[in-house]
Amino acid sequence: MNYKIAVVGPIPHDTIITHKGNTIVKYGCVTHPTIALSKLLKGRGEVIPISQVNKRDVSPILELFKPYSNINTSGIFSDSDQGTSIELKFLDQNNRVEKQLSNMKPISPKDVEPFLDVDCFVFVPITDFEVKLSTLKFIKENSKAKIIFDAHGPTTFVTDNGKRLRKYWKDKADWLPYIDVLKMNLEESICSHIEEDYTSEELYDENRTDHLEDFAKNVLKHGVEYLYVTLDSRGCAIFSNEDNELKHDFIKSVSVNNVVDTTGCGDSFAGGLSYGFTLYNDYVKAAHYANALGALRTQGKGFDVFKSLEETNNLIEETYS
């Protein structure tokens, strides 16, 4: 069977200063799950990155994807010459300061229309304006594809001077009916549930999880099938409804010894979810692949960190058998 997964969001030109002081320059976000999925789907399916990019970035992006024959690049648009550039400085392994240098033109229904036959759309926006709500509505009305959505976008905004800050996801009730699987990290779950001014507050507290059950009930009430909340190196929490009762699962992480770069871990995790749901329609298997891709992403600066299906399955087997 020829599976098709579309990865939707920005392909930013990233300048990354790691927590160890190293500088990495590369194209990020959509590229991580796209290349990871291309390796998992080799010989069995294709991956379609859908993004708006700067004209100057088209050639290097196409060159980046060129070694992977099952990446369909017809969804990379540059007609508006409006892509994303970002500078990221890591304070420690997980926390960073971000500055946005240019903004992407939002993904519209017109951009996704040629790809309505895919099995899954996985949205990985990193800022609140990058995907239009009308785009999700259009897919729901015209496609049978599963919609996986990363809450990084709607919980992040850009100030006039390019500073990237957290925000409360005020209109989430408008979005949730058009999302099948919602993915976020713990910090984003707080920004999605508790209405506060987050612009100057240190949000991250790995022990602050007491809000999750109430938040999950609200999310699932609006039609979302599964809520995944990543808990960094611990693993991920999954919330769903079973017999009208809230079901809470915890899936431990895939352990790694040396973390080189955590940029793109969330995007890679979302890509793993799309693989598990597309091939197995199994929320636990989806978490296994998500944790595996997120862990692999930390292991180096390049895309060679992602492995073949056989190697990835071996990693999953070692962790979860």
Residue ranges with predicted function:
Residues 2-5, 13-24, 39-125, 129-130, ...:
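Conserved N-terminal subdomain of the carbohydrate kinase-like
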Residues 10-11, 268:
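Active-site metal-binding loops of divalent metal-dependent hydrolases
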Residues 125-213, 241:
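Conserved beta-alpha-beta core of the PfkB/ribokinase-like small-molecule kinase fold
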